[in-house]
Design a protein with these regions (language model features):
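C-terminal beta-signal and terminal closure region of outer-membrane beta-barrel proteins
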Residues: 2-4, 154, 689-695, 749, ...
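Outer-membrane beta-barrel translocator/receptor signature
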Residues: 114-115, 127, 136-145, 150-232, ...
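Membrane-embedded beta-barrel scaffold of Gram-negative outer-membrane proteins
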Residues: 330-334, 340-346, 351-356, 594, ...
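Periplasmic-side early beta-strands and strand-to-turn transitions of outer-membrane beta-barrels
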Residues: 162, 170-171, 177-179, 191-287, ...
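Acidic, small-polar-rich N-terminal luminal/periplasmic segments of exported/outer-membrane proteins
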Residues: 36-171, 644
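C-terminal beta-signal and adjacent terminal beta-strands/loops
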Residues: 422, 606, 706, 778-793, ...
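Gram-negative outer-membrane beta-barrel transporters
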Residues: 398, 479-483, 491, 660-665, ...
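Structural signature of Gram-negative outer-membrane beta-barrels, strongest in the C-terminal barrel
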Residues: 239, 387, 397, 401-405, ...
């Protein structure tokens, strides 16, 4: 249902002709007059196998996007690639979520590795927070789909993203790019390439991106999500001789942004905090009609507030502060005509400020909060050695190497829960492991207390050490048949230390008793030892006095940190240590067949490659905190990929069609879900699904009907399903029963089953220069954003209850380039039809009963200018 009328933007869209594509041009700076004369597809070079090769000659499902294409499409951040790259999903937020073929990691916790490896000039970036790179001085981006466990190592069960920078060279050059747009968008990029002598070259680039956000928090009057990123990139290249070069880079990044606000809705009335446990919240005065939790969520609903507005209270803690520093050096030695050696060393540090991790209640009230309350520090040091060679007149091509990395992470997070109410009859029934009677009969005694510990402060210290050795070789059996074998062995040591401190229940009890309004607590430990007992309300009007509000007022947020001021008990401090080494081999084998020349028709079919690949990917296990149970071991996940594909150039190389069909088997897939610990506290934790599988197909089409017209299309269809996945029923576990739920019928979260893109780009040339118009169209099918079985049931009933129904986005761009080719001006619009679509965050229908929804960008438009020097 479209609740809001949206203004037309025909004046902006009218001058933009249909267009969409990944540009076929691989060079970073194509001259304007030369580009127009090319009526055939150019060769695209990629480094997916650690050596420069034609994309059409390698048995890997890869999409390559050049710097020209990024500018033509107006892509300023790699997150925008999700619109056109098959099976790729990227979500921005506190944790940058990158998914390929349904495989991804959605939390951003320091203890959990991502499943898509991101590489910057051969340097592995281990954390997801810094992986969404602004496209500053980028030469190309390659997206490798499917496990890349042999050459790229751990954390590539989904695939890899390889980002290559423009490198310093001998030609002095500079550029400036500036942009403005609605919502106070301001962008500035600038770079200069400056040689110092004949053998030493330097390059520097800056990026500043800011805007004021489009989503208003009515409680504060501030907008979110805002962009406020600044970065500086310095590079050098020393060509010491004809055979040896040394590249260095230094990167400094500063982020001061607000994350996206949310709206709240209730997907299930049977949730624990709504009707499941029949507990009261501040504002509830009738035990037979508990409405406060629902009303709190409704106060932050889109239906009540209107379009692009939220109500998350006066201190939602959405500020994201992240400082990043990176140093790297790459030495390349051409030992002989057939042998080269490369070494890559990197040092990386990050500091992230306090930030809200989750708001389970979803509304303005301060009832449940997960907050990182201290700075988080991350350090990593890595070294890689690559030996590339060939033999037998290039029939054998091989790569071998070693990889080592040490990473340290510190993470502080605090879980805070408001005091809640319960009637005496319900408490007695829960103590007997019985479901509560509803509605509650009149005349019951109100009690106040906690479901789970009121406050838990956790400090996580982690140290990860990775060692790996790898080799891969391709051999031409004959002119048409290539066999590739690869093998990698990875050893991953995980050391985790978790320190927790809980609230002082004796001090909380004294404050309640000291008020004179509450009696001595019961000894019924229904919700675990950390929760304490329940205290009867002694006021004259019973429930009509709103006893939960009276109790909650005794523990205000006096310091404004979005946490209740419960006293901590140092005697509850405990320390858990986990230390284990995980080892895994990730082999691969591939057979590629190239059609012989006598099968090819120069006009109809120009080249054709068919391949079959078997490969394996690995993601390390780790230790997960599970409430009072301390650290629990999470098994590694392993993916086995069976894939066949083809790559075809046809019709005098004016058409390129690449496709792949795959069947991927998952063992011990790592998933986050809502569960309980042994003391019956509700916890959000990782676990392993026994087995799951992915079956899918991908297709990319690029067609140049003429030198001025370019048509692109992409399609991905995936079927995700769990084969073995059971977990304890949450409500039964909370009341002390053991009942298992089969979740094998559920789909994977975040990734749609189907995605597609289609469009056309047209270019005119004349005395005034070159005018290029394009329109990008992208489509996503239904997306599930839930954590638990009840969320999936709500999603199946209606996708908008716990996900996002299918939607399409339309982007347009009109660019003029002067005859000299050194000045261009672009008018652009994104989401031209002003579509409203959800991009998360999460639905939890079994416990809190809320669906917290962040919304994608509304219609955006602006102007860009680029000047070359």
């Amino acid at each position: 249902v479209d609740y809001f009328a949206r203004p037309s933007l025909s004046a902006i869209a009218g001058g933009i002709a249909l267009g969409l594509s990944i540009s076929p041009f691989a060079n970073a700076e194509s001259a304007a007059d030369n580009t127009l004369q090319k009526g055939v597809l150019e060769e695209v070079l990629v480094t997916a196998r650690k050596r420069s090769e034609s994309m059409q000659d390698i048995p890997i499902a890869v999409t390559a996007i050049s710097a020209d294409s990024l500018r033509e499409r107006g892509i300023s951040n790699t997150s925008e690639l999700t619109k056109s790259v098959p099976s790729l999903e990227i979500r921005k937020g506190q944790a940058n979520q990158i998914y390929i073929r349904g495989i991804g990691e959605r939390t951003g916790f320091a203890r959990v590795d991502p499943t898509v490896g991101v590489y910057l000039d051969d340097l592995f970036l281990p954390r997801s927070d810094g992986q969404l790179l602004d496209t500053v001085d980028i030469a190309s981006i390659q997206v490798l789909r499917g496990p890349q466990g042999t050459l790229f190592g751990k954390n590539t069960t989904g695939g890899a993203m390889v980002v290559s920078l423009q490198k310093p060279d001998a030609e002095p050059a500079a550029y400036v790019e500036a942009g403005v747009g609605n919502y106070a968008q301001r962008r500035l990029k600038a770079g200069v390439n400056w040689p110092i002598g004949d053998h030493f070259f330097t390059r520097a680039a800056i990026n500043i991106t800011k805007d004021d956000g489009y989503f208003e928090n009515v409680a504060t009057g501030q907008n979110n999500p805002t962009n406020d990123r600044q970065s500086l990139l310095l590079q050098t290249r020393w060509e010491a001789s004809e055979h040896f070069s040394l590249d260095t880079q230094a990167f400094l990044g500063k982020i001061r942004e607000n994350l996206s606000g949310i709206n709240c809705s209730v997907p299930s009335q049977e949730a624990l905090y709504i009707q499941g446990l029949w507990v009261a919240h501040p504002g509830d005065t009738d035990p037979a009609n508990l409405r406060a939790f629902q009303e709190n969520c409704d106060a932050n609903s889109r239906e009540r507030l209107g379009d692009l507005k939220s109500n998350q209270g006066p201190n939602p803690r959405l500020q994201k502060d992240l400082d990043t520093a990176l140093l790297a050096a790459t030495a390349d030695w051409q030992i002989s005509d057939t042998l080269s050696l490369k070494s890559v060393i990197g040092l990386r540090g990050e500091k992230e400020g306090p930030i809200q991790a989750s708001d389970p209640d979803g509304g303005p009230a301060l009832w449940s909060s997960y907050i990182n309350t201290e700075d988080s520090d991350r350090r990593s040091y890595s070294f890689e050695l690559q030996l590339n060679g060939s033999a037998f007149e290039q029939r054998l091509r091989y790569t071998a190497g070693l990889f080592a990395m040490q990473e340290t992470n510190s993470e502080n997070f605090t879980v805070s829960n408001s005091i809640r109410g319960i009637d005496s009859q319900t408490l007695a029934e829960l103590a007997l492991s019985q479901s509560p009677t509803r509605p509650v009969p009149g005349g019951t005694v109100p009690l106040v207390g906690f479901i789970g510990a009121p406050l838990v402060v956790s400090d996580f210290e982690l140290e990860n050490t990775t060692l790996a050795a790898f080799t891969q070789a391709s051999f031409d059996i004959n002119q048409q048949l290539e066999l590739t074998l690869g093998y990698r062995i990875t050893e991953e040591q995980r050391q985790s230390e978790l320190s927790t401190t809980e609230a002082d229940m004796a001090a909380i009890e004294q404050r309640l008793l000291g008020s004179g309004l509450f009696g001595n607590g019961t000894n019924i430990g229904v919700f675990g030892p950390g929760a304490g007992g329940f205290f009867p309300y002694l006021g004259p009007l019973g429930w009509r006095d709103d006893p939960v509000s009276i109790a909650a007022a005794l523990f205000p947020d006096a310091d404004g940190d979005a946490l209740h001021d419960y006293p901590l008990d140092p005697n509850t401090r405990r320390k858990d240590i986990g230390d284990e080494t995980f080892r895994q081999a990730t082999p691969m084998v591939s057979l590629a067949y190239t059609l012989p020349d006598h099968w090819l028709d120069g006009e109809l079919l120009n080249s054709a490659l068919f391949y079959a690949t078997w490969s394996r990917g690995f993601k390390s296990g780790f230790f997960e905190p599970r409430g009072v149970d301390g650290l629990q071991r999470i098994n590694p996940e392993v993916v086995t990929n069976n894939e066949i594909g083809f790559k075809i150039d046809a019709f005098e190389r004016s058409v390129r069609i690449n496709g792949a069909f795959y069947h991927m088997d998952f063992d011990d897939q790592q998933l986050i879900a809502v569960g309980s610990d042994s003391a019956q506290n509700v916890v959000v934790v990782f676990g392993n699904a026994g087995q799951s599988e992915i079956r899918g197909a991908e297709l990319e089409l690029l067609w140049l009907p003429s030198s001025a017209l370019q048509i692109n299309a992409s399609l991905s269809i995936n079927n995700y399903r769990y084969i073995e996945f059971t977990e304890l029923d949450l409500q039964s576990a909370i009341v002390g029963q053991e009942k298992f739920v089969d979740r094998s019928n559920e789909t994977f979260p975040v990734s749609p089953d189907k995605s597609a893109s289609l469009g056309v780009q047209y270019t005119w040339s004349g005395d005034i220069g070159i005018v290029t118009s394009r329109l990008d169209l992208s489509y996503k099918s239904d997306v599930f954003y839930g954590f638990d079985p009840a969320s999936y049931a709500a999603f199946k009933d209606s996708p908008e209850k716990a996900g996002q129904p299918a939607y399409a986005l339309l982007d347009g761009r009109l660019t003029w380039q002067n005859p000299a080719g050194d000045l261009s001006v672009s008018a652009w619009a994104k989401n031209i039809t002003d579509e409203r679509y959800r991009i998360g965050v999460v639905a939890v229908a079994d416990s809190s009963g809320t669906y917290n929804q962040a919304w994608g960008e509304p219609r955006m438009f602006g102007l860009d200018l680029r000047q070359l020097f």
